[in-house]
Amino acid sequence: MGAKGLSGEGYEGHYFWDTEMYVLPVLIFTEPETARKLLDYRYATLPQARDRARILGHMKGALYPWRTINGEEASTYYPLGTAQYHINADISYALSLYLQVTGDVDYLKEKGAEILIETARVWADVGSFAECKGGKYCICDVTGPDEYNVLVDNNFYTNLMARENLRDAVGAVEYLKEHAPEDLKRLEEKLDFSVEELGLWREIIEKMYFPYDEKRQVYPMDDGFMMRKPWDENKIPPEKRAWLYENYHPLFIMRHRMSKQADAILGMYLHNDLFTEEEIRRNYDFYQEVTLHHSSLSTCIFGIVACDIGYLDEAYKYFSQSARMDLDDYHNNFYAGIHAANMAGTWQAIVNGFAGVRCQNGVLKFKPTIPKEWEEYAFRLKFKGALLEVRITKDKAEFTLLEGGEISFTVRGKEVVLKSGETYTCLLYTSPSPRD
């Protein structure tokens, strides 16, 4: 799916990581058959991704292109394109989410495991165990989602997503080894793969390095982020504050401590179960001060994380900006087409943000809230063949199983099991904002 869908000629119809991180999660929960077709596209372009990995010096594995229309890299500026290795982990994340939400083990056997193995192999080759970092595994000269900080060492988002890519690959191989040994043997022969590779993958998972600022108790976006000159927006003329690359030399931009879009915060949204709420709050507070939101992919993510930490007023502000981005033409580029990923991010801001939906370790979770500006909202989700309707009002949350024999999920940690036609109702409790 192109970044503009079929609405305009922006980006020439090219396909980016936006699809896996923003659009696919929506389709996985609403139209899983369509989601599977989008994953099929990535499987179909594995040969080109393998070729790309060889061009970049990796003798094993596959490296997906950052920008493509036919499976080959279409970006000509490698610092903002090819250096975004996180595309591999983004695809792995979307694939793993699909498998958890649908329970489609056949897809894992037929195509999914091959994608996970080939993407993991690149992570096992691109970095090194650095003595200067206490033997931790470091990944240098990459670009994260933030396009104002490029070719950095140990981008937090990249390292986090790479580790989870490796973890998912290990899990897939272990599953095949126990439940589908014939499929594992087929992959071993096809990919010249050995389960002995898992030893290195596990070591990297254990020793992955993450930059950390002890004084502020936050995770910097990369090793050099805290050394850069603070950005003073007040010194920038209003007419030059939009897309900075149009007005300033890249070196000027890269030497300042600011972020174009959600980067580390995006990682904390996707894997919020790996961090405490206080950790997420400290990082949110820090990055809110340095993020310019010059990308359409940013405000929806900050809104979701604001929900996670109880900042509902800020969450609604960010949601409104996302929802009205094309209507009000915030970025002055609607003429080129809609921002499809932002539209999907707006859906996520409601479902994953206000309703607190997550699927982690195969468990569907809810943490419902409601903005004070709304009386109620509702949506439907598909989960392992079941169709669940969720309706949230000022004082309660209702969950009704419309289709499917049975569904289990948790609401603020309490397990709920519904049979077809049944409804579960609970009182809505919204904690006071930590800002109050």
Predicted regions and their residues:
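Acidic/histidine-rich catalytic neighborhood
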Residues: 122-189
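Helix-terminus loop motifs that line ligand-binding clefts
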Residues: 1-7, 33-93, 99, 105-110, ...
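Carbohydrate-binding surface patches
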Residues: 375-404
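Catalytic cores of secreted or luminal carbohydrate-active enzymes
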Residues: 340-368
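Inter-helical turn/loop segments and adjacent helix faces that build the functional surface
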Residues: 29, 98-111, 171-184
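Carbohydrate-binding/catalytic loop surfaces
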Residues: 2-14, 57-81, 136-155, 251, ...
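Conserved small/polar residues in nucleotide/adenosyl-binding loops
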Residues: 429-436
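Active-site core of glycosidic bond-cleaving carbohydrate-active enzymes
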Residues: 13-45, 110, 167, 174, ...
